Curated annotation (Swiss-Prot):
The family this protein is said to belong to: Belongs to the krueppel C2H2-type zinc-finger protein family.
Keyword Ligase: no
Record organism: Mus musculus
Location of this chain's protein in the cell: Nucleus
Protein name: Zinc finger protein 639
Gene Ontology cellular component terms for the protein in this record: nucleoplasm; nucleus
Gene this protein is translated from: Znf639
Assembly and binders: Interacts with CTNNA2.
Annotated GO biological process: negative regulation by host of viral transcription; negative regulation of DNA-templated transcription; positive regulation by host of viral transcription; positive regulation of cell growth; symbiont entry into host cell
Amino acid sequence: MNEYPKKRKRKTLHPSRYSDSSGISRIADGVSGIFSDHCYSVCSMRQPDLKYFDNKDDDSDPETANDLPKFADGTKARNRNQSYLVPSPVLRILDHTVFSTEKSTEVEICDEECASPESVHQHTQEESPIEVHTSEDVPIAVEVHAISEDYDIEAENNSSESLQDQADEEPPAKLCKILDKGQALNVTAQQKWPLLRANSSGLYKCELCEFNSKYFSDLKQHVILKHKRTDSNVCRVCKESFSTNMLLIEHAKLHEEDPYICKYCDYKTVIFENLSQHIADTHFSDHLYWCEQCDVQFSSSSELYLHFQEHSRDEQYLCQFCEHETGDPEDLHSHVVNEHARRLIELSDKCGSGGHGQCSLLSKITFDKCKNFFVCQVCGFRSRLHTNVNRHVAIEHTKIFPHVCDDCGKGFSSMLEYCKHLNSHLSEGIYLCQYCEYSTGQIDDLKIHLDFKHSADLPHKCSECLMRFGNERDLLGHLQVHETT
């Protein structure tokens, strides 16, 4: 902008409507009613009044005489019958220029400086009510906004030096001015919301996102709907938000419990379903080998094989044709092939299987050394127990063993053989474990069960019976029972 703009004249009948754009109102220049600086527009719907002062007793008061306006010819208005126009006193409040139009009360002003308009408003709220004195000379303030910078109207007889002096004498914009409730002191809506004018086009822009609008009401509604604060109901641990405080309290109780920890990484959660989902999403492709007895997953077959060795310590594999038992499933498979191959062929021929023979029957069951499973080749059924696969093949895929014992897993081709086998179990009786729900028809099976299942919890074993105890004192007390008998 040019430092010395071209000066133009403009006359008006209502000089009190105008003041400069810098926030400082000027006194009308004589009777012409032209202000000394930029034009202002009044935001009030009321037309500001102009005070008429009669020239009475002016000659006796030199201070008043100096304040009288001059006419165009340089003479002062001294005649009593003359009346002249002057604008009312001006107050500057929060960077707004206000014209006084009516009678009001006298207001006390403090000189405390504030860092921002928001702090000024807060300071005025915290101040105690001031003492008000009624006066007819102090009018009510009406808020006035400066108009656009497009107006470039200046009054004549104002040099650039005088403009610079007046700018230097401008009062600080951050002075706190405490006004009473009767005055029109309102914090603008822009000070209550994080809003800015984006550019010269006049769009209101939200500071929290990219939203902008031509109308302030739209932006205000956007802030309320999209950026409503919910910090009071947010969990500090997982940052989850809740609509009410009661829901937040119930959620916080979950974090006080022991979390579920992923065995493959450092993931922790208080919700078991979240842990299951985490394993399925993150570790499912990395852990393809699992144990069918305890559902533990492994990333390699060697780890799974070592895990199976722990299970095999407390289990015995029984032959379905004889009393042979072993702890090695591969040994049981070799035993059936080597010792009972002829019997399998005979049973297969009796059932009319024709040319299927030994190879056809044995090919239905294979042993997977990598995964340590017995696998049915017909449907893929697998188990670590050879007895289970034999039972499955006998029932589902052949007619060799239509009758299978539920206690030991042995199969029989006829009902007569099956009933004889059941009588053998009844004659021996059923042996029950007193420490768990295990039952068997053979005493040796019960002894093996006690040694492998309960030896860790009950290490002290009675040599006279099958009783086991957790400490030596209980065992010594039990041995006294045998001595008395």
